[in-house]
């Protein structure tokens, strides 16, 4: 088996688990957050910087790499690891989320999805077999089955047809997988926000016996309470001895709540996306350092943080860089945000090892939500936007 997950300890107060993911490129402690390198690069950072942050596994995007530079070229270069000079593990998604986000540019059939490239408008067809062939060529350690990701809100009948198609596609992905001894193929469970469909999808996908399972179709606009409810329905139905991966989720509070409900792996572009607008994570919420209040603030982004940005620069300096459109400002905010999430997972793992995760979760969420509420109140009083990350970006090219 290309990847094996090892259970180390169960949390006595929740569904959380402490574990290890054994991969061809080393052991990864779980729960883990995976930085996203959509185009075979984590935006604004080089691989050594990502490694130094403590990341040991990153995600790359099949859809984007298929369109540019092409999976054949990546394979010719020796695979993703050599192409991007990354010594850790890599997970590739199947491209399903991106293709299904192209609502006006794609057509779904039982065979697969025809879509037009967001780059040049060229027409392409992605089937389960094609997606797996692309992922086999890219050479990641963990690859994801091709699934249909439904939007929110979603009609019940459509969601039901979708999970049944996803199950059929998952079986085709498994049959097409040409490198099972080198790459672990994870199945993906869906079901929108319908509890019975979440149960049905889990039953159908688990029956195919994958070495790990992605949980898809959440964090697509639904209220957080609904996401938590769906996790509580679906996660217990996934095999206890396999890793569980909540796809596209990466806000600090969602990581804590996901771990509480038994999730082992997470990914999201959020830390680098908001960094490009000067928004950073701190223990009491999100803070936008490009705001005028930080013009003469000579403290680090977060006192006590061990990241390169906080060890060397002040909020005032980083604000200056952002206002001057200097790339270093974006890099420093990205470094801090990624280190914040990697360290958060380190703290969660330490709390799980000590049997104190319930106390850690309570303290973290109380401080986080209190800080967020205070910033919203200050923003309302000032008639401003608070810590809003800036103008909305299109879903592509960077998506989740």
From Swiss-Prot:
Pfam families per record: TGT
Binding site for Zn(2+): 305, 307, 310, 336
Region spans: RNA binding: 248-254, 272-276
Region (Disordered): 375-400
EC number per UniProt: 2.4.2.29
Active site: 93, 267
Keyword check for Flavoprotein: no
Cofactor remark: Binds 1 zinc ion per subunit.
Biased composition (Low complexity): 388-400
Cofactors named for this entry: Zn(2+)
Gene Ontology biological-process annotations: queuosine biosynthetic process; tRNA wobble guanine modification; tRNA-guanine transglycosylation
A single MF term (Gene Ontology): tRNA-guanosine(34) queuine transglycosylase activity
Catalysed reactions, as listed in the record: 7-aminomethyl-7-carbaguanine + guanosine(34) in tRNA = 7-aminomethyl-7-carbaguanosine(34) in tRNA + guanine
SUPFAM superfamilies xrefs: tRNA-guanine transglycosylase
Functional pathway: tRNA modification; tRNA-queuosine biosynthesis
Key words, A-Z: Glycosyltransferase, Metal-binding, Queuosine biosynthesis, Transferase, tRNA processing, Zinc
GO cellular component: cytosol
Residues given in the record as substrate binding sites: 93-97, 147, 190, 217
Subunit structure of this chain's protein: Homodimer. Within each dimer, one monomer is responsible for RNA recognition and catalysis, while the other monomer binds to the replacement base PreQ1.
Family, as annotated: Belongs to the queuine tRNA-ribosyltransferase family.
Known function: Catalyzes the base-exchange of a guanine (G) residue with the queuine precursor 7-aminomethyl-7-deazaguanine (PreQ1) at position 34 (anticodon wobble position) in tRNAs with GU(N) anticodons (tRNA-Asp, -Asn, -His and -Tyr). Catalysis occurs through a double-displacement mechanism. The nucleophile active site attacks the C1' of nucleotide 34 to detach the guanine base from the RNA, forming a covalent enzyme-RNA intermediate. The proton acceptor active site deprotonates the incoming PreQ1, allowing a nucleophilic attack on the C1' of the ribose to form the product.
Record's protein name: Queuine tRNA-ribosyltransferase
Species for this entry: Symbiobacterium thermophilum (strain DSM 24528 / JCM 14929 / IAM 14863 / T)
Source organism phylogeny: Bacteria, Bacillati, Bacillota, Clostridia, Eubacteriales
